[in-house]
């Protein structure tokens, strides 16, 4: 595979994302390509895309193009919230994620942890549309009704687990790529079930939206492996959330710092 440079990747993305009424701007300071269409904006971090390209080849670029196209398609469509309660889900994002749209519409959110925040979205099949507070009034629905519907729908999603073990420490991965892998962190019944199953300390991570990691940590090696794993996923994710794992105790999630082969207390 030929060496991919920032300029080559920028040109390739512009070519594959070219469309009528679509503009591009490039920020050389942070190597970011911004795509604008009908007032909607998507910013792509070129270095991150190149890193994914080096691992996955053309599939990494195809995935980016797909997400951008579906995102613009979802933003352009009118979503009727009233008849879509069965398609509403909670979505986990970093606390730094914007709480309003570029047009100034406030998004429907709930607090979660010091690192994460809950947003709500209408599933559109291949993408989803974040719910704005103004949509509630139009649909004559309350925040609580949306929250209840979203969490009920989340509880009905399957949770297939893949397991890996390192020196007696077990790691479970949820990676369905349905857009709600990280959201399964919000499934309280699932967390309680896993807590009963695990024998060590239960530590979870949502480095990006398309993965949930659950560690059954027995020793410092387990913490070390989880720390490196979380950082790797965080760097590779299209929608990063947080590089900090969470300890799950007594029904609560507490962010912790892990460095090298030692665990630092929360």
Curated annotation (Swiss-Prot):
Family: Belongs to the UPF0354 family.
Signal peptide: none
Bilayer-spanning residue ranges: none
Protein name as annotated: UPF0354 protein lmo1608
Classification via InterPro entries: DUF1444
Domain of life of the organism encoding this protein: Bacteria
Coiled-coil zones: none
């Amino acid at each position: 595979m030929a060496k991919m440079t920032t300029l080559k990747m920028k040109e390739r993305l512009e070519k594959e994302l070219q469309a009528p009424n679509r503009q591009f701007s490039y920020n050389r300071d942070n190597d970011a390509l911004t795509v604008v269409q009908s007032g909607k904006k998507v910013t792509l971090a070129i270095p991150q895309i190149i890193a994914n390209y080096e691992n996955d080849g053309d599939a990494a670029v195809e995935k980016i193009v797909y997400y951008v196209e579906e995102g613009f398609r979802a933003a352009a469509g009118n979503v009727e919230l009233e008849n879509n309660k069965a398609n509403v889900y909670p979505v986990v994002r970093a606390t730094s994620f914007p709480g309003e749209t570029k047009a100034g519409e406030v998004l429907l959110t709930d607090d979660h942890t010091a690192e994460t925040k809950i947003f709500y979205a209408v599933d559109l099949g291949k993408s989803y549309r974040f719910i704005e507070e103004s949509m509630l009034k139009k649909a004559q629905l309350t925040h609580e009704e949306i929250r209840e519907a979203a969490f009920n729908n989340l509880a009905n999603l399957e949770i297939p687990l893949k397991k890996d073990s390192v020196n007696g420490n077990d790691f479970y991965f949820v990676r369905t790529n349905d857009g709600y892998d990280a959201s399964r962190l919000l499934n309280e019944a699932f967390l309680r079930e896993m807590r009963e199953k695990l024998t060590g300390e239960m530590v979870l991570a949502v480095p990006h939206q398309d993965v949930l990691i659950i560690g059954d940590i027995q020793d410092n090696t387990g913490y070390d492996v989880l720390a490196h794993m979380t950082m790797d996923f965080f760097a590779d994710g299209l929608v990063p959330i947080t590089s900090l794992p969470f300890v799950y105790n007594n029904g609560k999630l507490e962010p912790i710092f892990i460095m090298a082969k030692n665990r630092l207390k929360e």
